[in-house]
Each structure stands twice: as C-alpha cells, then as structure tokens.
C-alpha cells in the first residue's frame, strides 16, 4: 500500500543525511513493525515519507508514484509518540474538534462518530474526563482516536507503546490489531519491545539510517541467524552497516519483494474539507473554552487587565489635582506678575512631566499586556498546529482565529485602560480619540508579538524577544530620553509608545494639560488619526508575520 524507494532524509536542507537510500514496502491490511536501535532513523524514516523532514527519493501509494503531499495525507495519518491534544478539553471535546476541523459533518453524525471512535480505542467511559487527567496509555489511545477521525487507510505510529506499563502496551497493540483485522487498515508502528514482534505481520529493521531487512519474524531470525528476536541488536553491532546492506541486497527475500506487485486499487475519492469559515468558527469556540478553563491564564490576564490601570490611578491621584490651581491672572504690580508667571511655569513644568509620564505609563503597560497576549500563543502549541494542519486544518483559518482572538483581547484591554483612568482620575480630553488610540496600542502590540510567536519555534524565545521589544519602546520613543536628531525619525515610525503617547496627548488640546506639555516640548505631535494609522500599519506587519509564519512548516 505504502512504499519508498531510495529515500534519503535530512533534518534540514543541506544537512547530513540521517536516512540513506532507504527502500521499504508496507503491504495493505497488515500490521507492520519498524524496529532498530535507538537513534537509528526509524522516526526519521516516517517523517521523510510524510514530508515532515526534507527528503529525496520516491514515495509510492498503492503502487503509484506520489504526485502531491495532499494525495498522501488523504489516506495516511500520523500518530506521534505523545498524544497532541489540549489538556483543558475533555476527551469527547477533543474528538469533536477533530471531526469538525477535518470533515464536513452534521451534528448528529458528530455525536455518533464520537461514540464510535472512543469505543474503538477503549475510552468510551472517559468521554467527560479532561485530557490532562488521562494516564499515559489513555493519552496514546486518545491520539489514535484523533487520527482515526479522518478514517485513514494507513496509520503511521511513532513509538505509541514506548514508556508504558505492560498492560497499557498490550491494550494499544490490541487496538492496532483490531484496526487491521476488523477495519482493514494498514498500520506501521515504530516499536522498541522486541518481545512483541510475534504480534506483527512483518518486521522492518533499520540500522544506522538504512533499511537492512523486511519480512516476517521467522524470516528475520533466519536472515540474522538468531534464535530469539531479543538477540537482534547484539548481532547488528557485530558488523558494519555496509555489510548488512549488502547482505540484504543479495537476499532472495529482497528479490522476491522487489518483483511482487500489489494490485492497483481505484484512486481514492477526495475527502471534502470543511470551509475556512467553518474551521475558523470551531477554532474560536475551542480557544474561548480553553481560556475559561485555564484558571492560571484567566487569573493572570485579569490581574494585568485590572491591576495595571490601578497602578496608573495610584500615581495620578497624588499629582493631577494641582493642575486645577494653575492660573495666570495679572494681579498686583509688575514684580508680583513676574513672580506669578515664574511660579506658573514651575508648576506647569512639574505637571507636564507628570501628565506625559502618566500617558506613556499607560501605553507601556498596554505593550506589556500585548506581549503577554501574543508571545506564546502559537509557539506554545506549534506541535499541535502542525499535526492538525497535516490532518486537514487550513493554515489561514488557524491564523485568522489567533489574529481575531489576540487583537480583540488587546483592544479590549486598551479600551478598559482608557475608561478606568478617565473615570477615576478625570483625565481630560476627548473620549473617542483616546479610547481608539489606546485600543489600537493594545491590539497592534498583541498582534506584533503574535507574529513573533508564529515565526519562532520556541515559546521561550518568542517571550524573550517580545519582552525586549517592549523594553526598547520607552527609551526609543524620545518621550522620556532625548534622541539624537538623526535617530528621531529613523526609529520613531517603529515605536508604538510614541504614537500612542502623541495620539492620546493630541486629544487633550483644549486642556491645560496639553498646554503644560507643549511648553516643555514644542516638537511635532501626531494627531489621533495619524497615530491610529501608524499603529494600524504595525498591526498589519504583525499580521503578515503571522500568516507567513503559519504557512511555513515548523515542527518542534
């Protein structure tokens, strides 16, 4: 059913090959074991066949050369070593999401298929259990259920029995045998426990990146001149890879397999994928459900959303009332007038520093919220996304779901910051422009950090880079520290804090707060509309990074 010829697989383009000219054939309706010492290239071989890793050579499906990756993935599913599912979803919810993301199904069919899938893998009694509460063996069985949601013809399993107790291992193997015997599936399973080889129809041996045997267990024992399969790895270590390759090339069994031709079935009917809009709805529903179930995430988000505005209020209440006393009425003689003006200028300078600082403080806090919103959103679940994309999830639907969620969250935090501070501190200025400006700051920084999360594989790297990005916002804005003239308009277009600060301040032109600030700095300030336009450009750049990063394959 599935075969490869002269397949060479590399961890990345231009790197040293990990699998060298491998040829293997996995017949239809069989349970096939893929074995070899640790690090020999078993998983790499599977990933090369699936195009997860760059490869050279020929892949055949039903005896036909593969014409596209999509044609392969319509019939072949990949079950990784560790189940990739959201821990905060229940078992039934995980299966439901898989069905709705990969197939066009109605509600009645979904319910029926969920029951069928969970019964098939022995999780019928665990439908309401959170994934994070499952044991290791149950997680592996859930992984099989999720892969079977697309009803594949062939299932490639990467060490799904590794690290399990004997009972759990037997349960997994029983599920795999049932898939072959009762449903006619073809299953290829990477396995380490050589004592279980008697349960497989064929055994494929990989040694130092080369396929050196394929056949039934008795034939393997005869080929390597061993009595027990447990002696295999000791025997392999006695000779070089070249020796075993030459021995297999000269084997009569190898020649018989090369001459055998599997009948070509009719081309499989193309599986209809749900529309991008349908997948988008499923993803948004899942994201909201995950958000409310993750108490730590909810607590942190609420803490910064409501706590940061309180910090602004604490700093504002002690200083802003002094502005109400500012006046410049000409009373008394000439000397008294000069003294009054000097006093006014001193008071205005102090207040200008306070006002400008409070505005930039709000903007910086919103940038920090944006970093928290977006930095780990994709990098933290990259493996899950890549697995779902392989099964049929559209990258565009995934990217749009993240963009909508993160942008709305950031915009909402900006709006709340505006409302809270203005109501409690009676901050002057027009409500509309100030609300839009701070909402734009929150949304743009959230999306920019989301874009970084999409192009970086590690969530830690994405978080660190986002923190650096926020950290440089204040000094490079030119609001607190004066920049050299040559740098002002070189860096300013990229600094969200400047545009948020300027747009917010320009909405206060009718107040003494604005007059106090411009007395100290008479430089050009962007009006709110201009600030929002630049912040919108920042958001567009972040969105471009997001969609580009999601289109690229980045398996962890």
Label the model's feature ranges.
Residues 35-37:
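The feature captures the beta-strand-to-loop junction immediately N-terminal to the Walker
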Residues 144, 172:
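Hydrophobic anchor residue at the start of the ABC signature
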Residues 50:
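Helix-to-loop junction immediately C-terminal to a conserved catalytic motif
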Residues 96, 109-126:
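Conserved ABC ATPase "signature" region
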Residues 82, 87-104, 113:
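Q-loop/switch helix immediately C-terminal to the Walker
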Residues 223-226, 292-556:
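Membrane-spanning alpha-helical segments of multipass transporters and channels
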Residues 147-148:
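ABC ATPase C-loop
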Residues 57-67, 72-74:
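Conserved ABC transporter NBD signature motif
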